[in-house]
Amino acid sequence: MCADSSIDIWTWRELRASSTRRTLETRVRRGELRRIRRGVYAADTACASAVEAAAHGGSLGCETAARHLGIWVLDELSLHIWLRADRHHQPGISRACACIRHWDAGASAETFALPSVPRILLQIYRCRGGEAFFVALESARRLGLIGLDGLRWVRRRTDAAGRDLIDFSCADADSGLESLVRLRLRGYGWTVRAQVRFIGSGVLDLMIDDWLIIETDGKANHDDESHRHRDLVRDATAAMWGHATLRFDYAMVIHDWELVERAIVGMMTLRP
């Protein structure tokens, strides 16, 4: 994610609408503006991925745009570019690039502005599939980046499977790992709640059927002494109240789901 959600890339015409030619030429000489390609300029603080997208003639799209806005996405390192249906990409650059292009039509206030959040989510669904869509959707809802109108917009443009995921989504999950676990356990018929406040333990990541606690540690390091001690205290407090706890890190949930699932199912068979 970029430090600033602004794009700071403009066509020369857009720049000239608010500044004189002399002012702009001075900014270019000072390095405050740099030429990306003919007629397109970026601020020296512009997001590197957005600059690369603009060099192709488009904007950030799909998961790249979502990540730029702070929306949780599954690991996908490819650059996604929104070229719109009416854009002409730069063929000399595009042929040599492994970027993923999105050609869906849509309006934006500025030439290189991001797609709307509903459109970003729709691109993710069509490009990356249901799980990637679901974790991004719940993250966008958690961040307040999409409301009822936006959800309705996406619903009208997805198939039955997409609409089902929208209906199942909520705004409670604090990370994509929580969303992913909840989605993958859906078929078991358990009640899986995210961000559950628990006496003496603060807020828990997930709780299954009001008994089994699931903690999903993200990429941040939880191995230092203070984190380890805090986790042990939380687990002991939960056990004191008759609850079991399972902990999984990012790599386990993403790359070893079979083990995670078997552990959860095995523990649930021991439920009192």
Language-model regions, residue ranges each:
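Short gly/ser-rich loop at a beta-strand->alpha-helix junction or flexible surface loop bordering the NTP-binding
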Residues: 1-158, 269-272
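Surface segments flanking catalytic/ligand-binding clefts of nucleic-acid enzymes
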Residues: 141-272
